[in-house]
Amino acid sequence: MQILLANPRGFCAGVDRAITIVERALEIFEPPIYVRHEVVHNKYVVSKLREAGAVFVEELHEVPDDQIVIFSAHGVSQAVRQEAKDRGLRVFDATCPLVTKVHMEVTRASRKGHECILIGHAGHPEVEGTMGQYNNDEGGIYLVESPEDVAKLEVKDPGNLHYMSQTTLSVDDTADVIDALRQKFPDINGPRKDDICYATQNRQDAVRELASDADVMLVVGARNSSNSNRLRELSEKMGTPAYLIDDASCIDKAWLEGHEKVAVTAGASAPEVLVKEVIAKLQEWGGKTAVELSGREENITFSIPPELRPHPVG
């Protein structure tokens, strides 16, 4: 059995930054450090941070007064920011800078009274945070997930429309929705480049390359991870069966029966240690040395807040 490794895979710069912010806050200020929502969507990561003293909550009312709170990589609404400010909570913001970029697009449109259409998945925390940047009763913000949603959509002023998207969507599906928007609203404005982040794009490109050669695909990632789910869907769309797994213990040996080439990738919030455990399990079952495909190099990094940066010694 051959093991093919996607490249790139796993942690992106935004996830790295978010985890580092929590780790540094724990080191400097000591537990408990409160985090609104899972800082990234991965059970292993959240469990490790919880063991170190992070307390994960869903709403700010769960955070005691005079405490530190960290906003997750997915971002929060203006209302949540205002609530934290009103309560005097000390905030460290782990929102991915690429999500913040989308927030700024919405804020600019809102100030002008223009309407916004967000392409995204209902209920995802990133979508809730982005929708929550809009604050103008004269306009409006609408959520669509598919061309069918676009067909049913009615807006106030088709001449003053902007679209933006969740950063972790399927590249292909988003292109279909944008095409539908442009067809229905010819004057709609959008970002020069779509809002899907570089890491989402790169990991989907790697799966596209792998799926054409593999018999089955294992995607390391959490059920609530948007970008991990898109990797599984893309593989299946290309005709290669794919399974989303939290870790090696989730692999069913029956999935591999009759297959010579097993591909392994990981979502942007899945650590490499979980990938290594998957490879070890496959090798226990007769897998050969894993072969990593050549892929796009990623050298993007995002800085953490100044108060959390290590101070030079001497």
UniProtKB/Swiss-Prot annotation:
Positions bound to isopentenyl diphosphate: 41, 74, 124, 225-227, 269
Active site positions, chain numbering: 126 (proton donor)
Presence of keyword Iron-sulfur: yes
Any Pfam family: LYTB
Signal peptide: none
Reactions mediated catalytically: isopentenyl diphosphate + 2 oxidized [2Fe-2S]-[ferredoxin] + H2O = (2E)-4-hydroxy-3-methylbut-2-enyl diphosphate + 2 reduced [2Fe-2S]-[ferredoxin] + 2 H(+); dimethylallyl diphosphate + 2 oxidized [2Fe-2S]-[ferredoxin] + H2O = (2E)-4-hydroxy-3-methylbut-2-enyl diphosphate + 2 reduced [2Fe-2S]-[ferredoxin] + 2 H(+)
Top EC class, one word: oxidoreductase
The protein's role, per its UniProt record: Catalyzes the conversion of 1-hydroxy-2-methyl-2-(E)-butenyl 4-diphosphate (HMBPP) into a mixture of isopentenyl diphosphate (IPP) and dimethylallyl diphosphate (DMAPP). Acts in the terminal step of the DOXP/MEP pathway for isoprenoid precursor biosynthesis.
Protein name: 4-hydroxy-3-methylbut-2-enyl diphosphate reductase
Organism: Idiomarina loihiensis (strain ATCC BAA-735 / DSM 15497 / L2-TR)
Lineage, uppermost ranks: Bacteria, Pseudomonadati, Pseudomonadota, Gammaproteobacteria, Alteromonadales
Name of the gene encoding the protein in the UniProt record: ispH
